[in-house]
């Protein structure tokens, strides 16, 4: 179903606004609307809060609809100005979750701006950077070195979604992910590439509908044999047959988001070292 109407959506924070936008997008994805996104970060003074109120109210007047306003504001005086003054539908995420938790836990939260992504809190930041570097070094079969250090190894035909999934797992979960493209030489051998065999338990396969694969490849190399539908059908069939013979778990990425693919991989492979 196509989106039926538009609505301006504000994401307001005294930090970067990334958390507000992430939560907001997750919620809005449940509705058939076409949002116009406006992120307003670093709203950390009362003067800035009054400017935000004017911007929201101007938008409401122009469009004749209440803008949707997601906030992750720690500063209560700033939040109150926006709550009291704006003519939008305000959804205060921190207020929704933090204040009930304070009551239940019997302790006050830190009320620190940017606490969610504070890189000084622990060594998780450096671990994630290390995971990203590992995943880049081992992208598309570039390196077979230190595969024993990989948490997950993805295999599949070219353009089946291995690279974006690898980077998502590295950035969001701190996992070291290698990925390897299955090519005609692998199909001729009818078995996994020798370098991957010792790490079979870490391997997860991605496949894709041949017609969709042909469309994706045509965007990259239009009219080529690489993008030809018959070739795509053959490659996908060979890859799936190899994964079945080798006992490799796999899924089709055709209609799935990166988040859905990554979650399935985590459930199936269950890597020991996992950060959220």
From Swiss-Prot:
Q: Which UniProt keywords apply?
A: Kinase, Nucleotide-binding, Serine/threonine-protein kinase, Transferase
E.C. number(s) listed in UniProt:
2.7.11.33, 2.7.4.28
- Pfam families, A to Z: Kinase-PPPase
* An example Gene Ontology molecular-function term: ATP binding
Q: What class of enzyme is it?
A: transferase
Quote the InterPro entries the UniProt record gives: Kinase-pyrophosphorylase, PSRP
- Describe the reaction catalysed, as an equation: [pyruvate, water dikinase] + ADP = [pyruvate, water dikinase]-phosphate + AMP + H(+); [pyruvate, water dikinase]-phosphate + phosphate + H(+) = [pyruvate, water dikinase] + diphosphate
Binding residues annotated for ADP, in chain numbering: 156-163
Q: Which residues form the signal peptide?
A: none
Similarity section:
Belongs to the pyruvate, phosphate/water dikinase regulatory protein family. PSRP subfamily.
Q: What does this protein do?
A: Bifunctional serine/threonine kinase and phosphorylase involved in the regulation of the phosphoenolpyruvate synthase (PEPS) by catalyzing its phosphorylation/dephosphorylation.
**The name this protein goes by in its record:** Putative phosphoenolpyruvate synthase regulatory protein
Q: Which organism is it from?
A: Acidovorax ebreus (strain TPSY)
